[in-house]
Amino acid sequence: MTTDIEWGNQQKWPDCLVIVRHGQSVRNVAKNEAKIVGKGAFGTGLRDVDTPLTEAGRLQAKHTGEYLSNHFVFDAVFSSPYRRTVQTTEGILAAFEMKPPVVLEERIREIEFGILDGLTREGILELYPSESLRREREGKYWYRPPGGESRPDVALRVHSFLGTLTRDYRCKKVLIVCHSVVVLIFRRLLERWGEEEYIKVDREDDVENCSVTIYTFDQESKRLLLDRYNSAAHLKETRPKAP
């Protein structure tokens, strides 16, 4: 797949993409606590799509909005329709005097985990040992759980979304609020990664809650180039403490 769509010398990309992961959610906290104590599941009693932000997550969104409003005026905003991303978007835009239109975009929603939703590695091994083996054999990038998605599945829908940006939002400044896997998939597509590059960056560090990733259009190459990745300097006071 390629995302470098060009018609002659005319710019077809937005001037910049600012991609933000949602703030800390109730699900994030439950998952981290389950990992610490070795639990097999981290249920919250809510569907993934309905999971809200924590108070810390709301504060992260507020601080992110204060930071972005001092550096950008956006022409358009796209948010995953999940509750935690919508709340993050609302928290960010509260800092803006001029609020651009917000589009709830299903193509940038969270990866679908299928039957493994809400399970830790220990839980998968206990409840679905054959899936645990298949997951190890196929690898994190290609593995598709029953009823769920692989990373390439997510890439297909994000690639379609990028096509919309090149068609309708050229020369615009665009804010995108989404999820950690989707942030990495944007990088995989825009920087033309293969599996090895994706896994390498994924292993190096987690995409932080409310971190900012920025691409800017380069006139010489006619492409969006990475300006910064996973930047969370504006969140020093609101980062969750390491266990």
Range-by-range predicted roles:
Residues 38-43, 102, 129-138:
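A short C-terminal helix-loop "cap" of Rossmann-like NAD(P)-dependent dehydrogenase/epimerase domains
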Residues 14-17, 86, 160-223:
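Active-site-adjacent alpha-helix immediately C-terminal to a catalytic or transition-state-stabilizing loop
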Residues 29-92, 144-159:
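Loop-to-helix element that buttresses phosphate recognition and phosphoryl-transfer chemistry
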Residues 91-92, 127, 139, 189-190, ...:
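Residue-level signal for well-ordered alpha-helical positions
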Residues 2-18, 27, 59-133, 196, ...:
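Phosphate-coordination/substrate-recognition cap region in phosphate-metabolizing enzymes
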Residues 223-243:
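Acidic, His/Gly-rich catalytic cores of divalent-metal-dependent hydrolytic chemistry
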Residues 22-23, 79-83, 107, 147, ...:
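Short, well-ordered beta-to-alpha junction loops that form the rim of enzyme active sites
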